[in-house]
Amino acid sequence: FDVDGDGWTDSAYTWPLWGIVIDPDGVSTKPEPINIKKESDPINSFALDVGIPLLRDGPISLDFYAQYASLLGKTTNPLDTTKRENVGYGLIPLGLSAKLGPAHFTFEFRMVPDGKFQFGYFNRSYEVERATFQSISGNQGTIITKASKLGRFGKQNGFFSGLNINLGSIFDVGFSYQNLKGEQFDPSKNEFEKADNQSFTAILKLAKPISKIDRASWFYQQRNVPNPFDFEYSESTITGYNASLKLGNGMVLTYIFRRTFQDFNGDGD
């Protein structure tokens, strides 16, 4: 054995009459591996929606809707990291969805009354954000989950808007933007302070097949940052494209590209 990983086997320092004695060279032993079963941090969500049609006139329509959305799980209190608290909920008391020919517009007033919540928690970048490994002292590490970071979000209010347009029955283009204002935890000051929480998503896709191209799409997403139009990459940034080509005889070749960014030290940058 070489439990401390220094290259010297423990057998060289073993006394048969007394059992195994770890080599006394002063080198600290390797840390215990992370047990993902003990370190699990489950989270779930559910939502309740209600909608009322307000207008129907040929290609024109207008609908009103409202939503209550809640996350189910625990998060860490940033003011006292030994405390675990229930995650929060979000409200959309006013939502409008309008269609005018090829254009579809949505507008929502959003509220997070008690913080510890994100709209669109399970988004495209969730697989990257859901767990980050952070190195700590003593040659050890810990797992920082996305759920544990929800505690840094305080009370917030703002709006969400989205626009989808069919361009000449060939392309579909979509944009969405969220702007929430409220409180976020600043670790450098160890307190909550006023901050902007903005998100932006853009999508361009082929509306119908063209020749050998069966499907094609491109997207860009950045969520929960002070200003997504600065285009400063974070873990919530993801971009990529999909392309499918018909090869004949029922075969389709699909190429998928994703570009993501990972926070190696868990500091949020």
Protein language model features and the residues they cover:
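Long, compositionally biased charged/polar accessory segments in the mid-to-C-terminal portions
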Residues: 247-251, 264
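C-terminal scaffolding/assembly regions of large eukaryotic complex subunits
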Residues: 256-258
